[in-house]
Amino acid sequence: MGKIRKLDDQLSNLIAAGEVVERPASVVKELVENSIDANSTSIEIHLEEAGLSKIRIIDNGDGIAEEDCIVAFERHATSKIKDENDLFRIRTLGFRGEALPSIASVSELELITSTGDAPGTHLIIKGGDIIKQEKTASRKGTDITVQNLFFNTPARLKYMKTIHTELGNITDIVYRIAMSHPEVSLKLFHNEKKLLHTSGNGDVRQVLASIYSIQVAKKLVPIEAESLDFTITGYVTLPEVTRASRNYMSTIVNGRYVRNFVLMKAIQQGYHTLLPVGRYPIGFLSIEMDPMLVDVNVHPAKLEVRFSKEQELLKLIEETLQAAFKKIQLIPDAGVTTKKKEKDESVQEQFQFEHAKPKEPSMPDIVLPTGMDEKQEEPLPVKQPAQLWQPPKQEWQPPQSLVREEQSWQPSTRPIMEEPIREEKSWDSNEEDFELEELEEEVQEIKEIEMNGNDLPPLYPIGQMHGTYIFAQNDKGLYMIDQHAAQERINYEYFRDKVGRVAQEVQELLVPYRIDLSLTEFLRVEEQLEELKKVGLFLEQFGHQSFIVRSHPTWFPKGQETEIIDEMMEQVVKLKKVDIKKLREEAAIMMSCKASIKANQYLTNDQIFALLEELRTTTNPYTCPHGRPILVHHSTYELEKMFKRVM
């Protein structure tokens, strides 16, 4: 007798369920997407014990006809495609016909549905077996309940996480569906507590406010772009609003939430040096395209996609974000703590200021540079890589013994308070309508960010604090500037231009510098010698596993040539293939940091003024190359509020 046998349908469904139904969040995703495909405008999601005990989805969609109810629970039965051509023109969220039979095979499922023009159908299925089927009175739409998930697959149940973790997975997927379809009203309940309610009015910004808070919604930048193949809309936060993971970025393709690393990378590239290292924005991008340009049939979960014009799409995203940030004011405001206003107060007043809590004032160590005391120690000037700026009548190099190491940068005032996702919020059902109306009113009060351009206004120096922070003013209020970050931005744009030049002016080293590598590293570098010349690394083979450097570009910071060569080589050997664009970027960032003034260096008034004027000429005077803020703004009103001059 042969060893190969055909599996029965029940076992096949159990195997298929392993890919489609990984956890309760998978069930919620598939059932809610079915409701959206059925043209629902209102969907309720009820959970017990994070969906492990019970998941109930109620919608007002088209419903299922009686004759289709049994067929819907057979494998690969669907109403969404008819032939192979439809597979390349998919506009619906579901199409594989695997979700319902997979869910029914690992749970106890009850279905009540009606198309509205005939009696409804009541269906009970346990572990894939039909227990009961009958006609019933029902309104138009579908009410489906999934209980005792994984009751017949204890191995899968054993690997479920805690209630809190599983609930977090569900809320995450519901949030992203809500962003994808703001035209659908979604209600999410857990153990009879309402966690989310969206109005379904089509305003995605209101949905974002419901999920991430009003304060985050105030910091959103609208994104719009269109090409022959793609239409992009959405919102991303200002660079001052960041999170520690990419989980707060959502990408939607033709109404479908997808996980795509290259799309997230394109969003990050759009920010370029505006983001601190290891920080990520909150973002929502909706991309519309011809279904022929995207393959959604990659995995049964339908979260992965492939694009046929990926590079064009990535370039459009990057350029759109970069253009948007060039049009807006990026100086973060340092807010004032105010008591929470009562609901009957003006909503507009709630939106005027951030609620960042100021630190208690202490006695400042501020140097007033206008009247320098002759007895005090002569201040150290800024180092001058490539003569970026020169204070008048001062030509001398600072004694290195007096230059302290740069301290770890800590902003004296945080630009914005961290706003975690609110995973659970209890809503009183009696206040439901009032809460939604209030949210709608608040979102309406969020004004579009002023498009004032990227110009930094003139700043007039007041003094210097701890040899690290510069205080300046203008008619807009008080500005605090990190002097190291400011010159780092100036130097970065200078070096970025130099590293990118084809013809390099070189200077000979007095003694050739030798670099010893492992054989693997040597072979990797040897392949890229011509490319490395483009970033100022002129290497000659010296022996079997060594190179020597005889010259370097003249714009290398003086006294740090060999250190820069070592760090650039370290970047090269870490990469399997040299990315010249990335290497140029890293080289410019590294040299700008090394060539800039450090903390605890006191400057003259002329030096401070020259630094601020040079900063104004940069293309991005708001963040250093590492993404840290250069300056923080206190408006005159905020200062008056702080000192109780206004109430």
Curated annotation (Swiss-Prot):
Transmembrane segments: none annotated. GO terms for biological process: mismatch repair. Gene3D superfamilies: 3.30.230.10, Histidine kinase-like ATPase, C-terminal domain, MutL, C-terminal domain, dimerisation subdomain, MutL, C-terminal domain, regulatory subdomain. It holds the Pfam family MutL_C. Keywords: DNA damage, DNA repair. InterPro entries: DNA_mismatch_repair_CS, DNA_mismatch_repair_MutL, DNA_mismatch_S5_2-like, HATPase_C_sf, MutL/Mlh/PMS, MutL/Mlh/Pms-like, MutL_C, MutL_C_dimsub. GO terms for molecular function: ATP binding; ATP hydrolysis activity; ATP-dependent DNA damage sensor activity; mismatched DNA binding. HAMAP family: DNA_mis_repair. Belongs to the DNA mismatch repair MutL/HexB family. This protein is involved in the repair of mismatches in DNA. It is required for dam-dependent methyl-directed DNA mismatch repair. May act as a 'molecular matchmaker', a protein that promotes the formation of a stable complex between two or more DNA-binding proteins in an ATP-dependent manner without itself being part of a final effector complex. This is DNA mismatch repair protein MutL.
